């Protein structure tokens, strides 16, 4: 999932390391969905266009769903390039959530580069960096400090939320439309009552405990008629 725009980009005016004098294309990267018990982990890579400013960029966690949706469309329309990627539940269970998050971010940067937008510098939210073929650095709380990372956090969050809303259509009794897979009391109650779906992360302790009792949901058609 990507879109690019061919345009010359000068210094972006974002937070940069002091060792970088001029960055023509700064790529912000962030992920969404490390903590949930269900669903993929998503990541996005964004290179903003300094000639097309986007007002209201901020850490996706402090924005309302409506604001995120509006900004999602503006980012996709205004950015020089962007790419959204994910790592599946199966990959999360196979290599653990940290490495799956790194994989999703790596895929996002690779997808951006494959579309023709080659970053000079990649800045990643957090304290760890994925392996990419470009200069990369981690920025703690980068989603609140660097506009390109804020934009990436919004794309990743909205894309993941949309995926969980699709799961809600298949499994309405789990309440994915309200908790989006995160470990809330409502989600724990649904797991205890209905068991784990194929979309739950089996390596996560609350899900593993349910599975150990043989509580498995395999088909969405088994949902209660309400």
UniProtKB/Swiss-Prot annotation:
GO terms for biological process: DNA replication, removal of RNA primer; mismatch repair. Residues 24-216 form the RNase H type-2 domain. SUPFAM superfamilies: Ribonuclease H-like (SSF53098). Keywords: Cytoplasm, Endonuclease, Hydrolase, Manganese, Metal-binding, Nuclease. Its cofactor is Mn(2+); Mg(2+). It is found in: Cytoplasm. Belongs to the RNase HII family. This is Ribonuclease HII. It comes from Cupriavidus metallidurans (strain ATCC 43123 / DSM 2839 / NBRC 102507 / CH34). The gene is rnhB.
């Amino acid at each position: 999932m990507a879109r690019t725009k061919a345009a010359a980009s000068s210094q972006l005016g974002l937070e940069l390391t002091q060792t970088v004098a001029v960055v023509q294309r700064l790529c912000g990267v962030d992920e969404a969905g490390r903590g949930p018990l269900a669903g993929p982990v998503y990541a996005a890579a964004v290179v903003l266009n300094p000639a097309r400013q986007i007002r209201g960029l901020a850490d996706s966690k402090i924005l309302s769903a409506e604001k995120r949706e509006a900004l999602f469309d503006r980012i996709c329309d205004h950015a020089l390039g962007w790419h959204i990627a994910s790592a599946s539940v199966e990959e999360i269970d196979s290599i653990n959530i940290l490495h799956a998050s790194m994989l999703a971010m790596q895929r996002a940067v690779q997808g951006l580069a494959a579309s023709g937008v080659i970053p000079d510098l990649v800045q990643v939210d957090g304290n760890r960096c994925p392996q990419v073929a470009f200069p990369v650095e981690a920025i703690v709380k980068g989603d609140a400090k660097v506009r390109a990372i804020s934009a990436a956090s919004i794309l990743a969050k909205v894309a993941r939320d949309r995926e969980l809303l699709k799961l809600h259509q298949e499994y309405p009794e789990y309440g994915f439309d309200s908790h989006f897979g995160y470990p809330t009391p409502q989600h724990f109650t649904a797991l205890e009552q209905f068991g784990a779906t194929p979309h739950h992360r089996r390596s996560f302790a609350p899900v593993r405990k349910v599975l150990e009792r043989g509580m498995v949901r395999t088909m969405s058609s088994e949902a209660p008629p309400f």
